[in-house]
């Protein structure tokens, strides 16, 4: 196996000697390995083009002549042009073109014109190429949405403008669209086509304000759009917080007054963090801010929620959204991983575009679109490589623990460690034992790794050269491929400690500039400083006197894992998370490296995920496949009962387009098939049952139970008799394929409220809950709490339970209470109890 990061574009011009194509030339491009493109022999480039074209269905049996071919890399290997640039420049020069074919788009189902040829000469094309290289090519002009974007826009506009008998219908829509879909541009186009006068954009990433502002200009301030608005006496405006982008146009109150007066079209940008602080929704702001309330009280035509999976269903987010909802307000939620939102929408209210659809479209276009420029060509393919750490390192960090944990492997010494050891010394009567504790205390260095030797060996392993090693830095060639990478770690102190080791390491210190973006541990990059620091070091910033770094490693424990793009990153190293890590968080993180880029004049074609917890990677991939089926299956939404066949089909499609490979201690392993992934997950079925206390609903799925062998059935029965049942129905599934996972420190947190009742009717107040904070949300620091308080008794025989989950740092609203247990008189009915 070898790693591929970039490929080169070869532009070709061909002719077909028949009446239909007389006087016409086809311009296209293919991607080839860089060493082929570097050939200076034109005939070799022509052979490479033919090898690609002859394999395409539409070229079978076609006799053609290649008139011209060249590699599109130019300007000292720093830039490359595309076939699309040539098309646009030819059209700007009024060179006529002719469309000779039809193409049925699999996304929209629409038949469109295709197979574009130009009535020009080779000299015209060479002249255009020369202009492009001189920076005189045609600009991008009006935005042309890709087929899937056009369908998302069309379906959403149609839904919002449709009349429903049910007054609650037609008001909410969800885009389950992967990162890099273009949700901002497409969402703003919805606002434009619907003719909304007032649009509110809510984001959990205030730093992306500039991106929204730029996209606003592309939709609302093009010459054509402005001419149309001015003819109607309207002026489009973009505002944020108090001021408009043009301060002379006024503040929020002035802008909204002008909207109400029919003078302006307003797109207003605000962060969810800003709104939920308001006292108006029970927030913790010290001084009342009237602007927050004014924003929430305004009657918005259209509300777009960016990164909607991040806390929109948490209590604070719900309170904000409830204030924003008015009778005629339409709400569009945007997310690449809305796994926690899918059950809130019907199938007709969701548009889905995932990685599998994207990569299929990329392949389908090349095979069926007659060589026209591929709009998906820039989107890299992902590969996930799961590494099992060397046994030597695992054993050293595990010691007496049952499983390997990143949290333990990267654990740093704290003041608490010193205090605990000192207590042991003070209370130890045995002189020899006391001396051992004192020796251990002498080793303690605050904020340094407990297992520093093991981590240094791990770093050595990453760079250790051998003929079989596939660790990403184990050869000079690999280090060139992975010049800029993103490393995800368990916490701030762990990132700081690793930064110090990397700066001292023989290879990493000499070659790589280390960027610690962990900050204070907050996932938010409120002012964009972390992203700016990364980009400044990768690209250089003369104003800040920061030189360009050819090789960087960015360390983080959560910051920069969602909503941002660093095109130069070619790999992410995952050293945080567990089988409990939500698939949404995992996919958000790994897709940071899929941003398209031109690197040294070559197109970024592939990107990589190096995951050192194979169980977590497989679980996340399988869960993503499950959610993809769930999002597109009405029956699945209602019953949450997905067939194994459909899940396996989608998983097979995913790993075909995003290969998942297993590496045994850094050396070549094997590709996982969909069947193998599901087999591994099935092998831990009993373990999951034990961990969930038999309260996992999927354990009682007839389809699952039918697949158990007689031995597995007996094992399940034996363990159930031994452990009994526990109230953990809402706890996440914990799938551990091997002992290379993370520990409970990163497990999902859940809390409960209990209601005891004399009858099967839910009482109005809970019988016991944890303490409540100033906002009326339960806390978990109640020292007198015990499980006895949530047990049904003869006087109150019925127990109801409600739960809340910690999602992205915020507690969700408590679920509707359900009847959980009923008191039984075991002494009276001993035989029945024994039978049960």
Question: Predicted regions span which residues?
Answer:
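Conserved helicase ATPase motor motifs in RecA-like P-loop NTPase domains
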Residues: 176-180, 309-311, 324-345
């Amino acid at each position: 196996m070898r790693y591929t990061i970039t490929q080169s574009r070869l532009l070709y011009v061909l002719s077909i000697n028949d009446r239909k194509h007389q006087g016409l030339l086809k311009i296209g491009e293919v991607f080839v390995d860089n060493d082929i493109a570097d050939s200076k022999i034109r005939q070799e480039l022509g052979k490479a083009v033919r090898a690609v074209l002859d394999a395409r269905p539409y070229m079978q049996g076609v006799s053609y002549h290649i008139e011209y071919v060249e590699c599109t890399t130019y300007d000292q290997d720093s830039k490359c042009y595309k076939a699309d640039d040539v098309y646009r420049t030819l059209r700007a020069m009024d060179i006529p073109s002719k469309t000779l074919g039809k193409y049925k788009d699999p996304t929209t189902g629409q038949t469109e014109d295709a197979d574009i040829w130009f009535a020009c000469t080779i000299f015209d094309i060479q002249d255009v190429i020369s202009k492009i290289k001189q920076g005189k090519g045609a600009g991008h002009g009006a935005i042309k949405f890709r087929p899937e974007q056009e369908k998302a826009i069309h379906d959403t506009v149609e839904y919002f403008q449709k009349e429903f008998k049910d007054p609650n219908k037609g008001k909410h829509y969800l885009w389950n669209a992967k990162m890099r879909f273009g949700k901002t541009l497409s969402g703003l186009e919805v606002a434009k086509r619907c003719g909304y006068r007032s649009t509110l954009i809510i984001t959990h990433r205030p730093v992306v304000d500039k991106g929204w502002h730029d996209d606003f200009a592309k939709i609302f301030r093009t010459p054509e759009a402005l001419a149309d608005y001015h003819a109607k006496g309207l002026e489009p405006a973009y505002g944020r917080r108090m001021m408009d982008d043009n301060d002379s146009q006024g503040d929020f109150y002035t802008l909204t007054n002008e909207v109400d007066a029919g003078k302006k079209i307003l797109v207003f940008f605000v962060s969810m963090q800003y709104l939920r602080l308001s006292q108006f929704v029970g927030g913790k702001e010290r001084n009342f801010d009237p602007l927050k309330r004014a924003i929430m009280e305004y009657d918005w035509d259209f509300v777009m929620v960016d990164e909607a999976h991040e806390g929109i269903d948490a209590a604070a987010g719900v309170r904000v959204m409830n204030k924003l909802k008015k009778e005629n307000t339409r709400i569009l939620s945007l997310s690449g991983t809305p796994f926690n939102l899918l059950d809130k929408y019907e199938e007709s209210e969701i548009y889905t575009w995932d990685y599998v659809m994207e990569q299929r479209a990329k392949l389908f276009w090349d095979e069926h679109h007659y060589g026209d420029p591929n709009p998906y060509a820039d989107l890299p393919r992902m590969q996930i490589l799961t590494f099992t750490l060397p046994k030597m390192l695992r054993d050293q960090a595990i010691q007496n623990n049952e499983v390997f944990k990143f949290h333990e492997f990267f654990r740093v010494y704290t003041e608490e460690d010193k205090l605990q050891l000192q207590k042991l010394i003070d209370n130890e009567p045995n002189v020899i034992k006391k001396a051992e504790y004192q020796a251990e205390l002498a080793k303690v260095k605050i904020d340094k790794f407990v297992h520093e030797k093991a981590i240094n060996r791990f770093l050595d392993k990453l760079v250790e050269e051998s003929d079989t090693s596939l660790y990403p830095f184990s050869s000079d060639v690999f280090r060139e491929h992975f010049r800029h990478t993103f490393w995800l770690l368990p916490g701030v102190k762990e990132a700081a400690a690793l930064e110090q080791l990397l700066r001292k390491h023989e290879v990493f210190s000499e070659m790589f500039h280390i960027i610690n973006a962990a900050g204070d541990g907050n996932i938010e990059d409120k002012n964009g400083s972390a992203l700016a620091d990364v980009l400044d070091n990768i690209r250089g910033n003369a104003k800040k006197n920061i030189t360009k770094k050819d090789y960087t490693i960015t360390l983080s424990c959560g910051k920069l894992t969602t909503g941002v793009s660093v095109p130069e990153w070619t790999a992410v190293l995952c050293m945080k998370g567990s089988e409990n890590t939500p698939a949404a968080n995992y996919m958000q993180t790994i897709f940071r490296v899929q941003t398209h880029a031109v690197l040294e004049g070559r197109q970024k074609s592939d990107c990589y995920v190096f995951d050192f917890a194979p169980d977590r990677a497989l679980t996340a991939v399988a869960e993503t496949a499950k959610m993809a089926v769930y999002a597109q299956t009405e029956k699945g939404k209602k019953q949450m009962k997905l067939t194994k066949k459909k899940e396996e089909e989608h998983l097979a499609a995913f790993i075909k387009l995003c290969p998942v490979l297993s590496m045994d201690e850094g050396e070549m392993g094997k590709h996982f098939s969909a069947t193998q992934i599901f087999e591994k997950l099935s092998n831990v079925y009993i373990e999951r049952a034990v961990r969930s206390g038999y309260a996992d609903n999927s354990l009682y799925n007839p389809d699952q139970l039918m697949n158990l062998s007689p031995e597995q059935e007996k094992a399940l029965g034996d363990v159930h008799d031994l452990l009994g049942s526990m109230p953990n129905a809402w706890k996440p599934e914990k799938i551990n394929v091997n002992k290379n996972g993370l520990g409970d420190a990163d497990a999902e947190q859940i809390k409960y409220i209990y209601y005891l009742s004399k009858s099967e009717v839910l009482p109005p107040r809970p019988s016991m809950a944890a303490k409540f904070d100033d906002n009326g949300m339960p806390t978990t620091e109640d020292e007198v709490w015990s499980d006895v308080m949530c047990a049904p008794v003869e006087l109150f025989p019925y127990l109801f339970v409600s739960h809340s989950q910690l999602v992205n740092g915020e507690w969700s609203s408590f679920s509707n209470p359900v009847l959980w247990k009923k008191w039984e008189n075991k002494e009276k009915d001993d035989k029945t109890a024994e039978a049960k």
